[in-house]
Amino acid sequence: RGDIATDTIVICCGVWSPKVARMAGASIPLTPAVHQMIDVGPVPHFKDTKGVIEFPIVRDMDTNMYERQDGSGLEIGSYAHRAILHDPEDIPSNDEAALSPTELPFTQDDFDKQMEDALELIPDVLNDESVGIKYAINGLLSLTPDGLPLLGETPEVKGLWSAAAVWVKEGPGVGKAMAEWMVRGEPEIDLQSSDIARFYDCQKSRANIRARSAEGFNKTYGIVHPAEQWESNREVRLSPFYEREKALGAVFYEAAAWERPHWYASNEKLLDEFGDQINRREAEWESRWWSPIINAEHLAMRERAAMFDLTAFCIFDVIGPGALECVQTVSMRQMDVGHGKVVYTPVLSPSGTFKSDLTVMRLGDEHFRVVTGGAHGMADMKWYADHAPAGTTVIDLTSGWTTLGLWGPRSRDILASLTRDDMSHAGFPFGTCRMIELDSLRVLASRISYVGELGWELYVPIEQGAKLWDLVWEAGQAHGIAPAGIGVYGTTGRLEKCYRAFGFELDADFTVVEAGMTPPKVKGADFIGKEAHLRHRDSDPLAVLCTLTVEDHTSSSGQKRYMLGREPILAKDGSRLVDAHGRGSYVTSAGAGPSIGKHILMAYLPPENANIGEELLVEYLGEQYPVTVVTNDATGVFDPENTKVRA
């Protein structure tokens, strides 16, 4: 019918979306998968129903099934059968399909067990001999590698948007949110976890899409532990430290397809060293995907030094004419700083809420290096690239560089034994970076800290990473160095300092002011979200990010329980806490504080409850535990004066 010229296209073609996207040179990483459903009836129990739907849907989470009344019939759907995947190219055409292209022939063997479960659940409805199967299909729906929708502008093609992997329950909301995003530049609700730009190239491979989608299918109604790790398609991205880490008994979690140590079995000996300072979790649920070794590694870092594999960072350069303009526009903090300065900055949405937080190193007049979290790194890089003026290039360096973190009171002594460079506080101040020589390596060292200790991030080309590890490890032996995992870096060390994390405390639901991160002054240069941020500064916050400690862990059974995150925070009388914006208070992060001997929680509270010493409750698995507000700003509960970081 001819061509239509347009600047914007939205692909919302369901299971055909990948096929359509490839026509434009983009990737929509989903796979069609079978969801079995049967329609039985007429059901005598429903003979007097007048409407299509008069009874509530029943979700039987234990059997991964649902039952839904439909007129005089009953639909029974299942997520318990084996994962049955298809390729978009193999979906039959309208002419080839017996029913419709997404309604494939029913495979009865896959549903026999589910039918038995449905009969056990509602025998009064299904046991009548007059009830027969009216309709049975292997229907196709869309699965993604992480189980979330694929929304937003594709990173490959400007103006090509995706609204794919959207199930029926999400459809109306997604339509509204996508319209807002396209017209206003952001949706009203937080869709960052569903941003199609979140994937790295290796995560878009057919093998990964199918493996992760198959693994995730049976978890649709499953009980998934907050820290549960993927089992399929592992060891895709390996840091140069990987073999050393394996030899030390590293327990690997995955981050942006990288294998990253969470703790090291070789540090079990530290449990005896620190003894009663380390708590042991008694309940099986919160002991999953956790080890007391994490707390031991934490204490070894606080007392001596620890080294961390930070290769999963996403690293990209903004370089060329207009680079300063680009980073000023995207970053909230002042970027027009001296060469060698390191700036931590929030990245805001137009409405002044959080789009990310990251660090930026100024390496030259028009050369900036951005370091951000691996999980949202690709979306961050796209955001900078979207706002880069002509002549400015955004270059992904993630696979070209590796990062080793070294922190603890002995870290300066360790580096000093390897270099002639001045590593003193005067010679290498906090918040600066520069090239140093460690033995035969030239290393970009950045003096910042996410764990509240003196130390540096050390960057080298990835092929030099093994040498860097060996140098620091050997030099550290005389100082009692320990390898430490992300359990310390991302949880215990961070929480003791009350450092905020994107995706936990920082997201599109809260503002900089509410997060307690208001800078003393606002830079003169314009930046995305500035107008909204100025309004927020002039108004009292509707919520305050606080740090709380748990005062008593004892459950009704006498067993001590430890919160994992996302639990409701309640008033002392057990009533819900809801701020003036309608947001309920809940735990954004939870974890041990080994240095203070307390379990630490972070949560946004209504201002009237955000008082130091305020006694509240946290609800965990149906029971309530007493908690106390210990900070109502960004001051750490450990080393509040920051003397260790700036030693």
Task: Please report, for each region that a protein language model flagged, where it lies by residue.
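C-terminal catalytic lobe of FAD-dependent flavoproteins
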Residues: 62, 71, 97, 101-233
